[in-house]
Every structure is written in structure tokens, then in C-alpha cells.
């Protein structure tokens, strides 16, 4: 059995996840980051995107992180995020509508392009999470 470590994901609404796992893959600002037990200490930004957990029994679970910061230590990783969601919590129709709305706003001078791009990124992350169940 592979070695495990504690993963805590904390959102403004409270503790989203708190359990021992074998591995988690998150999206950092420079690409994907796989975290295992005994990882070198690191603090990094977390980009909007999906995350994938593998438990010691090899069961898998994925979800969505809407940005944040991760503090990684050999025995524990803590992710503070703006929001986290499990695929079953995502309304796919609403996410697709948000994607379409954001795409229109990116090309409209009346809207803040940066905010529209962030909304697009969130919508795509939600759609990807829901489709990868």
C-alpha cells in the first residue's frame, strides 16, 4: 500500500475536504502539479481547474477548484480556495450558459474583458469536471 498524506481543502464556506489520500493532482499557474506523501515543502498558487484525488484503495474522485493557494508539506497539504465543487453539485446547463455568456462578453467593449475571461475559465473548469465523472 502506498504512503498517504492529509489533504485539506478549505473554502470560504468551510472545510470542503479533509482526508488521507495517496495522491492529488491540481492545476498550478505553471501547469499540473502531482502531490504525493513526503513532497518537498512548497507554497504555490492554484489555478482555476479540475483536481483529481487518488485514495489509498485506488478509488478516484475529481472536482473543481476556483483558484487559491496550496501549502504543501511532507505529511499534509492545505488548499485555501475561493470555491470548490464536486461534479454532482455542478449544474451543467448553467455552466454551459455561463460559458456562452462569457464568450459573448469577451468580444463586447461594454464588458471588462479580464472578468469575462475569468468567468469563461470557471465555466470551462465546471464543464470539464462534470464531463470527467
UniProtKB/Swiss-Prot annotation:
Cell location: Cell membrane
HAMAP family: ATP_synth_epsil_bac
Topological relation to the membrane, as annotated: Peripheral membrane protein
Gene of this entry: atpC
SUPFAM superfamilies: Epsilon subunit of F1F0-ATP synthase C-terminal domain, Epsilon subunit of F1F0-ATP synthase N-terminal domain
Assigned GO CC terms: plasma membrane; proton-transporting ATP synthase complex
Pfam families: ATP-synt_DE, ATP-synt_DE_N
Main subcellular location of this protein, as a coarse class: membrane
GO molecular function, one term: ATP binding
Function: Produces ATP from ADP in the presence of a sodium gradient across the membrane.
Source taxon at top rank: Bacteria
Assembly, per entry: F-type ATPases have 2 components, CF(1) - the catalytic core - and CF(0) - the membrane proton channel. CF(1) has five subunits: alpha(3), beta(3), gamma(1), delta(1), epsilon(1). CF(0) has three main subunits: a, b and c.
Annotated S-S bridges: none
Keywords: ATP synthesis, Cell membrane, CF(1), Ion transport, Membrane, Sodium, Sodium transport, Transport
Source organism phylogeny: Bacteria, Bacillati, Bacillota, Clostridia, Eubacteriales
UniProt keyword Isomerase present: no
The family this protein is said to belong to: Belongs to the ATPase epsilon chain family.
GO biological process per UniProt: sodium ion transport
PANTHER family reported for this sequence: ATP SYNTHASE DELTA/EPSILON CHAIN, ATP SYNTHASE EPSILON CHAIN, CHLOROPLASTIC
Protein name: ATP synthase epsilon chain, sodium ion specific
InterPro entries: ATP_F1_dsu/esu_C_sf, ATP_synth_F1_dsu/esu, ATP_synth_F1_dsu/esu_N, ATP_synth_F1_esu_C, ATPsynth_dsu/esu_N
Activity regulation annotation text: Inhibited by nitrate.
Amino acid at each position: 500500500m502506498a504512503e498517504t498524506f492529509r489533504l485539506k481543502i478549505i473554502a470560504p464556506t468551510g472545510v470542503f475536504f479533509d482526508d488521507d489520500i495517496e495522491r492529488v493532482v491540481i492545476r498550478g499557474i505553471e501547469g499540473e502539479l502531482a502531490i504525493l506523501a513526503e513532497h518537498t515543502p512548497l507554497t504555490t498558487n492554484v489555478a482555476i481547474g479540475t483536481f483529481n484525488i487518488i485514495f489509498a484503495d485506488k478509488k478516484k474522485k475529481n472536482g473543481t477548484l476556483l483558484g487559491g493557494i496550496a501549502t504543501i508539506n511532507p505529511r499534509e497539504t492545505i488548499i485555501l480556495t475561493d470555491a470548490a465543487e464536486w461534479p454532482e453539485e455542478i449544474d451543467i446547463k448553467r455552466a454551459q450558459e455561463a460559458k456562452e455568456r462569457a464568450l459573448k462578453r469577451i468580444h463586447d467593449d461594454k464588458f471588462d474583458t479580464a472578468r469575462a475571461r475569468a468567468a469563461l475559465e470557471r465555466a470551462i473548469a465546471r464543464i470539464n469536471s462534470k464531463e470527467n465523472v
